[in-house]
Protein backbone atom coordinates (compact mmCIF):
# COMPACT_ATOMS: atom_id res chain seq x y z
CA UNK A 1 0.00 0.00 0.00
CA UNK A 2 1.27 3.42 -0.79
CA UNK A 3 2.22 5.52 2.15
CA UNK A 4 -0.52 7.84 3.29
CA UNK A 5 0.14 11.43 2.46
CA UNK A 6 0.05 13.48 5.58
CA UNK A 7 -1.61 16.89 5.16
CA UNK A 8 0.75 19.81 5.49
CA UNK A 9 0.13 22.22 8.29
CA UNK A 10 -0.26 25.76 7.11
CA UNK A 11 1.27 28.39 9.31
CA UNK A 12 1.02 32.11 9.00
CA UNK A 13 3.70 34.35 10.43
CA UNK A 14 3.01 37.96 11.21
CA UNK A 15 6.45 38.69 12.55
CA UNK A 16 7.73 40.14 9.28
CA UNK A 17 4.65 42.26 8.81
CA UNK A 18 4.84 43.52 12.36
CA UNK A 19 8.51 44.35 12.00
CA UNK A 20 7.84 46.12 8.72
CA UNK A 21 5.01 48.07 10.30
CA UNK A 22 7.23 49.05 13.18
CA UNK A 23 9.90 50.22 10.77
CA UNK A 24 7.34 52.22 8.84
CA UNK A 25 6.05 53.81 12.02
CA UNK A 26 9.57 54.74 13.04
CA UNK A 27 10.31 56.24 9.65
CA UNK A 28 7.04 58.16 9.74
CA UNK A 29 7.83 59.53 13.16
CA UNK A 30 11.26 60.56 11.96
CA UNK A 31 9.87 62.45 9.00
CA UNK A 32 7.32 64.32 11.09
CA UNK A 33 8.37 67.59 12.65
CA UNK A 34 8.51 67.63 16.39
CA UNK A 35 5.92 69.98 17.91
CA UNK A 36 8.42 72.71 18.74
CA UNK A 37 11.29 71.90 16.39
CA UNK A 38 11.35 75.52 15.18
CA UNK A 39 12.81 76.48 18.58
CA UNK A 40 16.06 74.88 17.46
CA UNK A 41 16.66 77.40 14.67
CA UNK A 42 14.34 80.41 15.27
CA UNK A 43 15.36 82.38 18.39
CA UNK A 44 12.54 83.46 20.67
CA UNK A 45 12.12 86.96 22.09
CA UNK A 46 12.85 87.89 25.71
CA UNK A 47 10.64 90.98 25.78
CA UNK A 48 8.22 91.17 22.87
CA UNK A 49 7.17 94.71 23.77
CA UNK A 50 10.66 96.05 23.05
CA UNK A 51 10.70 94.69 19.49
CA UNK A 52 7.37 96.22 18.45
CA UNK A 53 8.46 98.74 15.76
CA UNK A 54 6.76 101.80 17.23
CA UNK A 55 9.44 103.90 15.52
CA UNK A 56 7.62 103.22 12.24
CA UNK A 57 4.94 105.67 13.34
CA UNK A 58 7.48 108.44 13.97
CA UNK A 59 9.17 107.87 10.60
CA UNK A 60 5.80 107.99 8.87
CA UNK A 61 4.65 111.12 10.71
CA UNK A 62 7.99 112.77 9.94
CA UNK A 63 7.59 112.13 6.22
CA UNK A 64 4.08 113.59 6.18
CA UNK A 65 5.27 116.57 8.19
CA UNK A 66 8.08 117.11 5.65
CA UNK A 67 5.57 117.30 2.79
CA UNK A 68 5.17 113.75 1.54
CA UNK A 69 2.09 114.62 -0.50
CA UNK A 70 3.71 117.72 -2.06
CA UNK A 71 7.21 116.46 -2.96
CA UNK A 72 6.82 112.71 -2.91
CA UNK A 73 10.12 111.51 -4.37
CA UNK A 74 12.36 113.84 -2.35
CA UNK A 75 10.62 113.14 0.95
CA UNK A 76 10.60 109.37 0.36
CA UNK A 77 14.34 109.43 -0.31
CA UNK A 78 15.10 111.59 2.74
CA UNK A 79 12.78 109.42 4.82
CA UNK A 80 14.70 106.33 3.75
CA UNK A 81 18.04 107.90 4.69
CA UNK A 82 16.61 108.96 8.05
CA UNK A 83 15.28 105.47 8.71
CA UNK A 84 18.70 103.80 8.37
CA UNK A 85 20.23 104.94 11.72
CA UNK A 86 16.88 104.28 13.40
CA UNK A 87 16.87 100.80 11.89
CA UNK A 88 20.42 100.20 13.16
CA UNK A 89 19.27 100.92 16.72
CA UNK A 90 16.19 98.74 16.24
CA UNK A 91 18.34 95.89 14.91
CA UNK A 92 20.50 96.06 18.01
CA UNK A 93 17.40 95.99 20.23
CA UNK A 94 16.25 92.87 18.39
CA UNK A 95 19.66 91.27 18.79
CA UNK A 96 19.95 91.75 22.54
CA UNK A 97 16.40 90.41 23.00
CA UNK A 98 17.02 87.07 21.30
CA UNK A 99 17.02 84.02 23.54
CA UNK A 100 19.53 81.18 22.98
CA UNK A 101 18.37 78.42 20.69
CA UNK A 102 16.96 75.22 22.08
CA UNK A 103 19.17 72.15 21.65
CA UNK A 104 18.29 70.01 18.65
CA UNK A 105 16.95 66.48 18.99
CA UNK A 106 17.88 63.54 16.77
CA UNK A 107 14.81 63.99 14.59
CA UNK A 108 15.47 67.69 14.17
CA UNK A 109 18.91 66.92 12.81
CA UNK A 110 17.52 64.32 10.42
CA UNK A 111 14.85 66.71 9.15
CA UNK A 112 17.38 69.39 8.27
CA UNK A 113 17.01 69.54 4.49
CA UNK A 114 20.41 71.11 3.99
CA UNK A 115 22.01 67.97 5.36
CA UNK A 116 23.95 69.76 8.06
CA UNK A 117 22.85 70.28 11.64
CA UNK A 118 22.75 73.75 13.09
CA UNK A 119 25.39 74.37 15.71
CA UNK A 120 23.45 75.61 18.70
CA UNK A 121 26.62 76.44 20.58
CA UNK A 122 27.10 79.48 18.36
CA UNK A 123 25.08 81.76 20.58
CA UNK A 124 24.87 85.53 20.55
CA UNK A 125 28.16 85.95 22.36
CA UNK A 126 30.10 84.54 19.39
CA UNK A 127 28.69 87.00 16.84
CA UNK A 128 30.29 90.16 15.56
CA UNK A 129 27.37 92.45 16.33
CA UNK A 130 28.44 95.54 14.32
CA UNK A 131 29.21 93.35 11.31
CA UNK A 132 25.86 91.56 11.58
CA UNK A 133 23.89 94.80 11.85
CA UNK A 134 25.87 96.46 9.06
CA UNK A 135 25.38 93.40 6.86
CA UNK A 136 21.65 93.45 7.51
CA UNK A 137 21.41 97.05 6.28
CA UNK A 138 23.55 96.37 3.22
CA UNK A 139 21.82 93.12 2.26
CA UNK A 140 18.42 94.75 2.70
CA UNK A 141 19.40 97.52 0.28
CA UNK A 142 20.61 94.95 -2.24
CA UNK A 143 17.40 92.94 -1.88
CA UNK A 144 15.36 96.05 -2.66
CA UNK A 145 16.25 95.55 -6.34
CA UNK A 146 14.56 92.13 -6.72
CA UNK A 147 11.73 93.46 -4.55
CA UNK A 148 11.37 96.35 -7.00
CA UNK A 149 11.05 93.85 -9.86
CA UNK A 150 8.43 91.87 -7.92
CA UNK A 151 6.36 95.01 -7.27
CA UNK A 152 6.49 95.86 -10.99
CA UNK A 153 5.44 92.33 -11.94
CA UNK A 154 2.51 92.54 -9.52
CA UNK A 155 1.09 95.50 -11.41
CA UNK A 156 2.85 98.64 -10.21
CA UNK A 157 2.75 101.52 -12.72
CA UNK A 158 5.96 101.90 -14.69
CA UNK A 159 5.76 105.05 -16.79
CA UNK A 160 6.83 108.09 -14.71
CA UNK A 161 6.47 106.04 -11.52
CA UNK A 162 9.58 103.83 -11.57
CA UNK A 163 11.59 106.03 -9.20
CA UNK A 164 8.73 106.18 -6.71
CA UNK A 165 8.37 102.40 -6.86
CA UNK A 166 12.12 102.02 -6.30
CA UNK A 167 11.93 104.21 -3.19
CA UNK A 168 8.97 102.14 -1.99
CA UNK A 169 11.03 98.96 -2.38
CA UNK A 170 13.88 100.54 -0.40
CA UNK A 171 11.54 101.34 2.49
CA UNK A 172 9.88 97.91 2.40
CA UNK A 173 13.18 96.05 2.23
CA UNK A 174 14.27 97.72 5.47
CA UNK A 175 11.00 96.79 7.13
CA UNK A 176 10.94 93.19 5.89
CA UNK A 177 14.48 91.89 5.39
CA UNK A 178 16.33 93.75 8.14
CA UNK A 179 14.69 92.06 11.14
CA UNK A 180 14.69 88.67 9.39
CA UNK A 181 18.43 88.89 8.78
CA UNK A 182 19.10 89.66 12.44
CA UNK A 183 16.73 86.89 13.52
CA UNK A 184 18.27 84.27 11.23
CA UNK A 185 21.85 85.48 11.71
CA UNK A 186 22.35 85.65 7.92
CA UNK A 187 21.33 81.98 7.58
CA UNK A 188 18.74 81.64 4.81
CA UNK A 189 18.21 77.95 5.60
CA UNK A 190 16.56 78.89 8.90
CA UNK A 191 13.87 80.84 7.08
CA UNK A 192 13.43 78.01 4.58
CA UNK A 193 12.98 75.49 7.39
CA UNK A 194 10.37 77.71 8.98
CA UNK A 195 8.02 77.20 6.03
CA UNK A 196 8.22 73.42 6.51
CA UNK A 197 6.78 73.58 10.01
CA UNK A 198 3.27 72.55 10.97
CA UNK A 199 0.94 75.31 12.22
CA UNK A 200 3.03 77.96 10.46
CA UNK A 201 0.71 80.88 11.18
CA UNK A 202 0.51 79.96 14.85
CA UNK A 203 4.29 80.11 15.02
CA UNK A 204 4.37 83.45 13.19
CA UNK A 205 1.77 85.21 15.33
CA UNK A 206 3.43 84.00 18.54
CA UNK A 207 6.70 85.60 17.40
CA UNK A 208 6.92 89.40 17.45
CA UNK A 209 9.40 89.75 14.59
CA UNK A 210 7.73 87.26 12.26
CA UNK A 211 4.30 88.74 12.95
CA UNK A 212 5.54 92.26 12.19
CA UNK A 213 7.09 91.16 8.90
CA UNK A 214 3.95 89.32 7.81
CA UNK A 215 1.66 92.24 8.64
CA UNK A 216 4.06 94.63 6.87
CA UNK A 217 3.43 92.66 3.69
CA UNK A 218 -0.29 92.47 4.41
CA UNK A 219 -0.56 96.19 5.15
CA UNK A 220 1.29 97.10 1.98
CA UNK A 221 -1.01 94.84 -0.03
CA UNK A 222 -4.12 96.42 1.53
CA UNK A 223 -2.66 99.84 0.82
CA UNK A 224 -3.49 99.40 -2.85
CA UNK A 225 -7.24 99.60 -2.17
CA UNK A 226 -7.67 103.40 -1.71
CA UNK A 227 -5.66 104.39 -4.81
CA UNK A 228 -8.33 103.88 -7.52
CA UNK A 229 -11.15 105.41 -5.45
CA UNK A 230 -12.61 108.65 -6.82
CA UNK A 231 -11.75 110.81 -3.83
CA UNK A 232 -9.02 112.93 -5.46
CA UNK A 233 -7.05 113.24 -2.24
CA UNK A 234 -3.30 114.07 -2.28
CA UNK A 235 -2.51 111.04 -0.14
CA UNK A 236 -3.94 108.75 -2.84
CA UNK A 237 -0.83 109.25 -4.97
CA UNK A 238 1.20 106.17 -5.82
CA UNK A 239 2.69 104.72 -3.59
CA UNK A 240 1.76 106.66 -0.44
CA UNK A 241 -0.98 104.31 0.75
CA UNK A 242 1.28 101.28 0.23
CA UNK A 243 4.02 103.00 2.20
CA UNK A 244 1.61 103.83 5.03
CA UNK A 245 0.21 100.28 4.99
CA UNK A 246 3.68 98.77 5.24
CA UNK A 247 4.83 100.96 8.13
CA UNK A 248 1.60 100.66 10.11
CA UNK A 249 1.30 96.95 9.33
CA UNK A 250 4.59 96.29 11.09
CA UNK A 251 3.32 98.01 14.24
CA UNK A 252 0.00 96.15 14.09
CA UNK A 253 1.85 92.85 13.66
CA UNK A 254 3.99 93.45 16.73
CA UNK A 255 1.01 94.46 18.87
CA UNK A 256 -1.01 91.50 17.58
CA UNK A 257 1.78 89.15 18.66
CA UNK A 258 1.66 90.67 22.16
CA UNK A 259 -2.09 90.04 22.33
CA UNK A 260 -1.77 86.46 21.06
CA UNK A 261 0.98 85.64 23.56
CA UNK A 262 -0.98 87.23 26.41
CA UNK A 263 -4.11 85.18 25.82
CA UNK A 264 -2.22 81.98 25.02
CA UNK A 265 -0.58 82.11 28.43
Swiss-Prot record:
GO terms for cellular component: endoplasmic reticulum membrane. It comes from the Eukaryota. It holds the Pfam family PIG-F. The chain crosses the membrane at residues 49-69, 79-99, 137-157, 166-186, 209-229, 240-260. Glycans are attached at residues 111-112. Keywords: Endoplasmic reticulum, Glycoprotein, GPI-anchor biosynthesis, Membrane, Transmembrane, Transmembrane helix. It is a multi-pass membrane protein. InterPro entries: GPI_biosynthesis_protein_Pig-F. It is found in: Endoplasmic reticulum membrane. One of its GO terms (biological process) is GPI anchor biosynthetic process. Signal peptide: none annotated. Pathway: Glycolipid biosynthesis; glycosylphosphatidylinositol-anchor biosynthesis. Acts in the GPI biosynthetic pathway between GlcNAc-PI synthesis and GPI transfer to protein. Belongs to the PIGF family. This is Glycosylphosphatidylinositol anchor biosynthesis protein 11. It comes from Candida albicans (strain SC5314 / ATCC MYA-2876).
Amino acid sequence: MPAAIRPMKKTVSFSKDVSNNNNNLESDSDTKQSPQSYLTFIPQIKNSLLVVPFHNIFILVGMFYSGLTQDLETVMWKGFLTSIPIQVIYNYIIYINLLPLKKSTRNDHQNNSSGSAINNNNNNNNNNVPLLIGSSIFVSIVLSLPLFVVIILMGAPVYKYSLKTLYLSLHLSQLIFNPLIILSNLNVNKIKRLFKQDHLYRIIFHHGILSSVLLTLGGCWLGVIPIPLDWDRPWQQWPITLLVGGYLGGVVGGVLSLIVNYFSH
